């Protein structure tokens, strides 16, 4: 599954659940909260796994708000990053 497919799957879920109108600032507050939980539980793999997934979904929600083409951004990111490997 591509990043854009994951983004679209989250968009579909958001719409069904009524979360598709959640403001980006509110989503970022949730990101902060999830990062706090993650920081407090770094020795608990099950919690880390869960929080990473929560964060991924929140990032995909933000990408939906901005119609971000995540596949293209991924490619651009790594092309730009390659210069640091030389």
Positions of PLM-derived features:
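Flexible "arm" and connector segments at domain edges
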Residues: 1-52, 56-86
């Amino acid at each position: 599954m591509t990043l854009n497919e994951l983004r679209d799957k989250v968009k579909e879920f958001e719409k069904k659940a009524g979360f598709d109108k959640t403001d980006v600032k509110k989503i970022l507050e949730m990101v902060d909260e999830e990062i706090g939980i993650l920081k407090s539980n770094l020795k608990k793999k099950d919690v880390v796994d869960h929080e990473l997934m929560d964060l991924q979904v929140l990032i995909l929600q933000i990408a939906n708000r901005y119609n971000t083409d995540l596949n293209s951004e991924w490619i651009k990111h790594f092309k730009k990053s390659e210069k640091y490997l030389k």
